[in-house]
């Protein structure tokens, strides 16, 4: 498919057919000239637009590096949904912000080596935590409401879901953190409860009233 053979290609400026030394696939790099890329052959896995002649994105997508700036700047969402802006874009080079927008970069192409918080939004792919990056552990739908960035230790970075490992600062008596019991007092929230991803409070033995109201707690707590 990559070899150059004598193929039948239609002219972009006439309805006549001519024999030209074009690769079998119209949208391979040597064949992206306007005289070779006709509307019909361009409906391939690489060139998604109807016509390579009228689409500057298709021209750039035919180059060895699919997600160059020339492609992403002129690319429409319909052009980037197929393979031209997928894994090669996010794996061969670090994810660029113009590349990893939700319409272009699918979760399959956001690998840990390329996913940086600045380029891979949660809708595109889940960020991969790094010890020096606290922006990964910001509030999101995947994290408990009571866990802030100060709860995220580097040890939580092993999870692709970026689930934070809570520190004692996480278990402050926040209503959404301290179980359903509305009468839960600060004495109910001990640092030991922070081993839970949900930051549910561990009842203090001195606060039997709170122990009785907190769901999921043992009555002998």
Swiss-Prot record:
It holds the Pfam family Keratin_B2_2. GO terms for cellular component: cytosol; keratin filament. Keywords: Keratin, Repeat. InterPro entries: KAP. Residues 26-214 are annotated as: 18 X 5 AA repeats of C-C-X(3). Restricted to a narrow region of the hair fiber cuticle, lying approximately 20 cell layers above the apex of the dermal papilla of the hair root; not detected in any other tissues. The keyword Nucleotide-binding does not apply. Sequence repeats lie at residues 26-30, 31-35, 36-40, 57-61, 79-83, 89-93, 99-103, 104-108, 109-113, 114-118, 119-123, 124-128, 136-140, 146-150, 151-155, 177-181, 188-192, 210-214. In the hair cortex, hair keratin intermediate filaments are embedded in an interfilamentous matrix, consisting of hair keratin-associated proteins (KRTAP), which are essential for the formation of a rigid and resistant hair shaft through their extensive disulfide bond cross-linking with abundant cysteine residues of hair keratins. The matrix proteins include the high-sulfur and high-glycine-tyrosine keratins. Belongs to the KRTAP type 10 family. Interacts with hair keratins. This is Keratin-associated protein 10-3. The lineage of its organism: Eukaryota, Metazoa, Chordata, Craniata, Vertebrata.
């Amino acid at each position: 498919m990559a070899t150059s053979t004598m193929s039948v290609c239609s002219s972009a400026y006439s309805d006549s057919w001519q024999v030209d030394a074009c690769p079998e696939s119209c949208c391979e790099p040597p064949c992206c000239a306007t005289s070779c890329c006709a509307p019909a052959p361009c409906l391939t896995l690489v060139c998604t637009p109807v016509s390579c002649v009228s689409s500057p994105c298709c021209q750039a997508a035919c180059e060895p590096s699919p997600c160059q700036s020339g492609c992403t700047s002129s690319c429409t969402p319909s052009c980037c949904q197929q393979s031209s802006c997928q894994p090669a874009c996010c794996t061969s080079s670090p994810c660029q912000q113009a590349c990893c927008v939700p319409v272009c970069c699918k979760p399959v192409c956001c690998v840990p080596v390329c996913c940086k918080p600045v380029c891979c939004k949660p809708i595109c792919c889940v960020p991969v935590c790094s010890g020096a990056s606290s922006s990964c552990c910001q509030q999101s739908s995947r994290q408990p409401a009571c866990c802030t960035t100060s709860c995220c230790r580097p040890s939580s970075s092993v999870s692709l879901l970026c689930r934070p490992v809570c520190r004692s600062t996480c278990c402050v008596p926040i209503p959404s953190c301290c179980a359903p019991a509305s009468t839960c007092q600060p004495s109910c929230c001990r640092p030991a409860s922070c081993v839970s991803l949900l930051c549910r409070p561990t009842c203090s033995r001195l606060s039997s009233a709170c122990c009785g109201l907190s769901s999921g707690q043992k009555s002998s707590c």
